[in-house]
Structure formats: structure tokens, C-alpha cells
A protein has these predicted regions:
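A compositional/structural signature for long, glycine/proline-rich flexible linkers
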Residues: 1-392
Length: 392
């Protein structure tokens, strides 16, 4: 067959070219940036865009609310919008006119949440969190999703498109068991119809538009915090809603960090009693930094505590010699995201920028320290945990 052999060829060609033109135009987002103007930031900027291509196609084309299939939103090699290294994200689109059922087993993962958002990021229709999920003695559970209420676990669907967002927060990466889970539309149905040119054309248009708008959204997010470097801010951009849209029960704080090669940003805080807490690094493009081979995040089960129950965390280019280290991986600017989950208090960590060389004399005599052998063991367990959570 050759071009022109079907009546749809011209439309398909135009749709593909327009999609590719949108991808090409996004380069201005990287080259016009002033925050991350190093070679590393440029390279990771285009990596950011390349990852968004697959996300755009998954979000706006490779899904059908009538035949829902859960897919992994974030992985170690496909990241976006401040992904949490502790978290496995499962998502799919649903139609508010239908009824769906989730079935699965809770596993032993530290914390889970089920969220139904509208078509817009800042609209939440319903949520079930860790403490609200009703399970059987063996950990099995079922959740109904519909516009009309059901007994037991139920998530309300809004009219039109609904985005199901499932989070699993792992504390001990190398031991906790993930949920087993599936979703289906209730009823008897024929298999989905074959792909049509019309659906492909519509999907490419929607994916291209979403790629342009959403990739810019997270570049703007980091810029929102950049005028207050090395300090914590709980406010979020106006389009993000009340700051808790992502998962009810969370309290989020953000810090735009700016650190030279001989500096360290020291956080100190006494964590409150809570279901889960963490600190995580993201680069200028709001992608988590390498968490398989570097210490780019820390949670309550991984942390080493001081005698008084506090934690001391160093964000730096070089190993500071204390247990809780966040390795910037060559970046000089980026974000730290911090979460308290199901906590009665939400303390703000102290933040102090120092010279790495000054750290030993600034530490109290009884401060926790770490040997090179202990650091290697930390990293070994970390890689095992990532490989276990994201098997081939």
C-alpha cells in the first residue's frame, strides 16, 4: 500500500504532522529557561519533554473509560510532576455514567489512597485513604465506583470524565508487599471495537495539546517557588486548588533549593506521630532525581533519628558524613517536597545553608554519623528495593 490508497490518508498525515509540530515547538520551554541553564539542566529538560510524550499518549489516547486498565503513571525512567520515589502510582480514566468495581488485596505497604479527580487537576470527587479502607481478614477488599452510593467501600464519580488515582507509599522498600489490584466496568460487554482513523486523529490532537499545556505547568510550578530559595513554603500555585487535592490527609511543604558544590542545606525537624512522612528531591523540571543509585529521598522508616527523636538531613553535592543525606546528583537548583500524612501536627523543618567543611564543628557532640561501609549498605538496600518494586 502507498499514500493515498485509503480515503483517510490525508487526514492521518496531517494529524501526525501537527502532533510532531507540537512536540518540536516545546523546545522553547527548555531554551528560554533561566533557572536551569547548565548543560545538565538542558539535557534533563529534553529528557523531561521526551518522557512527557509517552505520558501524553497514555493520558489522552491509549485509554478507554469503557474498558479501563490500570497503568503505572511513574517509574524510575518515566517521571513527572514531583513524583515520590516511595510511591507506586496506578491510574486510569473512568466515565461517570457507568459503575465500576475495584478488587484486590491490601498487601503490607505502609500507606494507600484511592482518589477520584475530575477532568481538571484541582477537582476531587471522592477519596478513600489508608485508615478508611475496609478489608477482609486476609487483606482482600472491594471498592465500588459510581454516581450513586453503594454500601461498604465506595468512591463517588462525578459527571463526565473521572481520573482514578491510586497511591501506594512504601516505607521499607525491600520488605513491604504491594497491593494486588484490578478495575473493571460492571456488566457484560463485547470486546472494545478496533481502532478507527477518527479515534486516532482525535487522540493525537488531544495528546499534543495536553503535552504542550501540562509540560509547561510544572516548569511554571518550580518558578513559583524560585524567588524564595532555601526556605519552606506551604502555599501552592492557584491552579492547584487547596493544596490537598493530591490525596486527602496529606500536608505538603516545598523548598526551592539553590546549592553550590561546597555547600549543604541542613534540615532539622522532630517528626510528629503520623502514618507516613518523607523528603524528596526533584530537579528543575520537577522530576525526581535518580533514586535507584543515589539518595534522593528519605522517609520515616529509612531515617536515622537523633537521641531526642529529631532528624537531621543534609542536601549536598558530596557525602556530608551524616546518615540522612539527599544527594543532588550534580544539580545546583531544584525542589524538595515534604509530606506529613495523617498527622495531627505539621512542623516546618528548619533550613540552614552552610559550607560542607563547617558541618563537623557545627554538629553537636552526640550527633549521628555514618561510615563509608554503612553508606554502601544503605545504597545496596536502596537499589534492591527499587528493583523489587519495579520488576522487569
Amino acid at each position: 500500500m502507498a499514500y493515498g490508497d485509503t480515503p483517510y490518508d490525508e487526514q492521518l498525515k496531517r494529524a501526525w504532522e501537527e502532533f510532531c509540530d507540537k512536540l518540536k515547538s516545546a523546545q522553547s520551554l527548555i531554551f528560554n529557561d533561566t533557572l536551569g541553564a547548565t548543560a545538565l539542566d538542558r539535557a534533563t529538560g529534553f529528557q523531561y519533554l521526551s518522557r512527557y510524550i509517552s505520558k501524553a499518549l497514555s493520558e489522552k489516547f491509549e485509554n478507554d473509560p469503557l474498558y479501563p486498565q490500570l497503568w503505572q503513571l511513574q517509574t524510575p525512567t518515566n517521571k513527572s510532576f514531583g513524583d515520590n520515589p516511595d510511591c507506586t502510582y496506578l491510574v486510569t480514566w473512568l466515565d461517570g455514567a457507568h459503575t465500576y468495581k475495584i478488587a484486590g488485596n491490601r498487601g503490607t505497604v505502609s500507606w494507600v489512597s484511592f482518589l477520584v479527580n475530575g477532568a481538571e487537576f484541582n477537582i476531587t470527587h471522592s477519596a478513600i485513604n489508608n485508615s478508611q479502607l475496609k478489608t477482609e481478614w486476609d487483606g482482600s477488599f472491594q471498592i465500588m465506583l459510581s454516581a450513586q452510593q453503594h454500601p461498604g467501600n465506595w468512591l463517588k464519580l462525578g459527571p463526565g470524565p473521572n481520573f482514578l488515582f491510586i497511591r501506594q507509599f512504601f516505607g521499607e522498600w525491600d520488605t513491604e508487599e504491594p497491593m494486588w489490584i484490578r478495575v473493571e466496568r460492571v456488566g457484560d460487554f463485547e470486546p472494545p471495537p478496533p481502532l478507527t482513523p477518527e479515534r486516532l486523529i482525535r487522540g493525537l490532537e488531544n495528546a499534543g495539546n495536553w503535552f504542550l499545556s501540562d509540560s509547561k505547568r510544572w516548569v511554571d510550578w518550580v518558578e513559583f517557588y524560585s524567588d524564595q530559595p532555601n526556605q519552606w513554603v506551604s502555599k501552592m500555585p492557584g491552579w492547584a486548588g487547596d493544596g490537598q487535592t493530591g490525596s486527602l490527609g496529606r500536608q505538603l511543604q516545598f523548598c526551592y533549593w539553590k546549592i553550590q558544590s561546597d555547600e549543604a542545606l541542613i534540615f532539622e525537624v522532630k517528626p510528629p506521630r503520623c502514618a507516613y512522612w518523607n523528603f524528596e528531591l526533584a530537579n528543575r523540571w520537577f522530576n525526581s532525581t535518580d533514586y535507584r543509585y543515589r539518595f534522593s529521598s528519605l522517609n520515616g522508616k529509612q531515617a536515622v533519628y537523633e537521641d531526642d527523636g529529631s532528624v537531621r538531613i543534609a542536601v549536598s553535592h558530596v557525602d556530608p558524613g551524616i546518615p540522612n543525606w539527599l544527594d543532588v546528583g550534580g544539580h545546583c537548583v531544584g525542589m524538595v517536597n515534604q509530606r506529613w500524612v495523617e498527622a495531627q501536627e505539621h512542623p516546618v523543618p528548619t533550613a540552614k545553608l552552610i559550607k560542607v567543611a563547617d558541618l563537623p564543628r557545627l554538629l553537636p557532640p552526640n550527633a549521628r554519623r555514618i561510615t563509608p561501609e554503612q553508606r554502601r549498605e544503605q545504597l545496596r538496600r536502596r537499589k534492591i528495593g527499587v528493583d523489587r518494586r519495579f520488576p522487569v
